[in-house]
Every structure is written in C-alpha cells, then in structure tokens.
Amino acid sequence: MSDKIQSRESKTTKPTKTEKISDKSGNLSQVKSSKNLSKSQSIYLEIDSLSKKFLEEGRQYIYKWIRDEYGLSKNEATALDISIYNTTIARMINIYKFDETLAAFLPFKFGKEIISPRQDFYGFATTCGTILYYQSFGDTLGYYNGNWEFNYGNDNRPDYVNDLISEFIHLGGINDISMVNWLASDDTILYLITARVVLEYFFQGDNAEISYFGTRLRQEYLKAKPLIQNRHPGQTTMDSLDIMSNIEWDKLPYNSRAIGAGAAMRSGSIGIFYPGRQNRKKLVALAVECSRITHNSATAILGSVTSALFTAFSLEKISVNLWPHYLLEILRSNIIDEYIEQSRPNEYSLFSRDKVIFQGQWEKYVSSRFSGVNPRDLRYMHNPVERYRYLTENFSKGCDMPGGCGDDCVIMAYDSLLQSNGVLEKVVVYSILHPGDSDTVGSVALSWFGAYYSTKKNLDILSPRFDELEYSNEINNLIWNTEDFVLGLTKVFYKFIYIDIATDLVEQSMKLK
C-alpha cells in the first residue's frame, strides 16, 4: 500500500535565493529556499508565501463578487472589503484555534516560533490530518478482523446490540481497548487511495479536467483489488472492478440495483480539499465520479455526495443540526441534476427517477427527528437497542445489511454524530456497536466526528489507538511526511475558508443596509 500513498515525486530544487513562483493556472506556487534550512524551516517559508498568495486571491474574489453582486462603486467596495477582511481574519483565528498540547500531531515537528504567527492555520491543518486517523479507527474497530462486521454469522436482531456493547467493554472499552494486530477493512484502503488521488487532482490546478480524476481513480482502485479481496469488500465493488478492467473510467453502465455504501465509505476526503459554497459544484462532480467507478446508481451516488459534503460542513463549522437541512436544499436544487445531465445525458432519466428514493429517506428522517432545525429529544433514541430498531425499520428496507446501502449508511452515521454531542464513546456505541454494516457506518461517522470534534480530550483517548492502526504509517506518510498535504491546505484555508466566511459576512452586512 505504501506505493499508493506516496507524494508526488517531482519536488523543487532549492537555490540559495528565496523566490516566489507565480502560477496563473491556479496550481500551488512553491517557494525555493536555501539548502541550509531544515525541512521544517523550508516548509514554513513555503506556507508563509502561499498563505499570502491565496489570501490575496480570496480577497480579490470577494471584492469582485461585491462589485458584481451589489453594484457598489470602487470606493464603497474597497471600504467594505477592508472591513470584511479584518472581521474574517479575526473569525478564522477564533474558530480554528490551535492548542499547543496538540503539537505532536503537527507536520514536520514545527516549533512554537513557527506555529505562533499562524495558529489558526495549524489548528485547521491538524484537524484535517487527523480525519484520516479517525476514519481508519472507526473502520478497524467496526471490522474487528471481520467479526463484528458480520456478527459471527448471527442475525441482525436489534437486541444483539447489547451483546456487542458487552464485548466492547470486555475488550477494554474506549479507554483501554488494544487494536494491535487488528486488520483494516477495504474501507480504509479505498479511503486512503481516494484521498491520495484527490490530492493529486487538487495539485493539477483549478482548471483540471474531471477525466484526470476518473482515470487515476480507476487505475488506483484496480491496483488495490488484490489488497481488498480478502477484507470482505462489497460484491458490487468487486464485480464493477472486474468490468472496469476492460472499459474506460466513465463507461460503467447505470445500475439501479448497485445501491451499496461502497462509495460513501471512501469519498469523504473530497470534502477536506473542497469546502465552501464556491466549491459545491466541484465537490459534487468529484463525489459523483468517485461513486460511478463502482456504484453507478442514484442511491450510491448521492450517498457519496453526502459523505463528502458533510466532511466539508464539518470543516466549515456549520452546526451539525443544520446538515440535513442544507443537504435537502442541495438535493432540491439543480446542482447535482445539472452535473448528471451534462456528464451522462443518457442516464439522467434513470437517475432522476431513482433520486426521489434517497431524497425521500432524508425528508422522512428530518420530519421524524427534527422540530424545525432542532433535533427532537426522543427518549427511545438514548437506548442503543431501540435506536437501532428505529433506524433499521425506517431506513434500511431493501438493504442486505442495515447500514450497507448508500442512503441508510449516511443516515445512521449522521444520527450517531448528532446523538453523540461530541462525546467519543457515544459515537462509537451508536455507529459501530450494532449488527449492521458496522465498519462502514463507523468509518463514515468517525471521519465526520474527527473533522468536527477533534479536541485534545478525544485525541488523548485515541492517539494510542492511532499508533496501533494497520495503516498508521501510510496515513502518516500521506499527511505529514510529505509537503503536499499541508501545502495544499494553505489554499483550502486561506482561499476557500476565507471566501466562505467572508461571503457570509458580506451578506449579513448588506442585509443591514
């Protein structure tokens, strides 16, 4: 797997003079620095230069949008831009605080003198990096070497939840469980491969063709087939890869029966690199194609979009209560439909027909679980057995295993996050300790949990488990031991996150006038 998680091989040489390289295509610029600098110092100089570049691009985007959207004069737009800039920076510092006790999770072991001037960025980068650990933890625990995913061959009766909780406690519970020699399932392997391809695509620049992404996904998924075949992959995944070996990346036929969660489990990393409203269409396109490689159905595609979208919502710090409401807004809009119709017009009528099932599931969920935008306090949902019964009886009909479909998987994962209220043990119990597709629901829920609730307390509990993960070294190599991940996040933070926050502030400001 290590060959699949390595960084781009092409790195810049480092002449003695420090210089900034501009790139009008939207690719990441790089700063070339002295050979005498340590790796940490060299990366810091690159981050410093890139942060200024992308912050300026973000400001220019907002300034132009102000002029175009509101018809302000140059002087009015300039004055508003200055005000919005100062408020946005203050808000970014406040939202993405960095706790110095988390320094062990930083890339390249940066010292305090490097962290201090950009604590908000390093707080954001730390959160993004740990998402991959949380995902693999959820998968590995839920898989339990194939035991819990298939419940030792037992049936899916709700009261079996209590047996799993008892076994989890016997294994040590959240504080003392040991996962040494526990295997990851196909979920971790495909999630990491997808993250690496997303990062490659991100470095191609703003105008990169979607075909690059699809071609690389096809290549890497096919390479991974021998790795995943003994880790209980979904039958649809394996059958589709067999077909994909003989066709192009975008030629898998639409299949209304391919409704599994195989895409939802691996697409979350798209949301790490494409948060913000200005990136919604890009996120949708990537998530759709991520699914179509193996699961070309409306249910699977929309599960993939939801997984990526909720990761983005996490990093945008949108209240968890609002996620399903915003999801329904997007489902009712034309964003997804337009891409489906434009990219594969011959399949649009089938997609449109099946889309109502996925949308209906979420409408039913919101209607029963929410009063307005606030979740209802339903006492039976505090009981793990009754909670599982409610979710499976209402949202898992037609699935071979509860949590194994593209729609019920993300509903179960989201409800686990909602019900947890930031408590690690709760999200583990609700998302993993049930007789359904525990590794997939667990991996999706824990990845969102890590993006939204990656606190010192939770990291103190889980960091020993992170070291025990089968793919711990591969995760570490992807996010910290190469420059690409952290340098890519400079654009995400200083351009995409800046634009997203600034847009909200501008809209609020203009409403007051």
Swiss-Prot record:
Matching InterPro entries: ADP-ribosylglycohydrolase, Ribosyl_crysJ1, Ribosyl_crysJ1_sf
Keyword terms of this UniProt record: Hydrolase
Domain of life: Viruses
Compositionally biased tracts (Polar residues): 24-33
Hydrolase is among the record's keywords: yes
The keyword Translocase belongs to this UniProt entry's keyword annotation: no
One Pfam family recorded for the sequence: ADP_ribosyl_GH
Basic and acidic residues composition-biased segments: 1-23
EC number: 3.2.2.-
Region (Disordered): 1-33
Any one GO molecular-function label of the UniProt entry: hydrolase activity
Protein family membership: Belongs to the ADP-ribosylglycohydrolase family.
Protein name: Putative ADP-ribosyl glycohydrolase L444
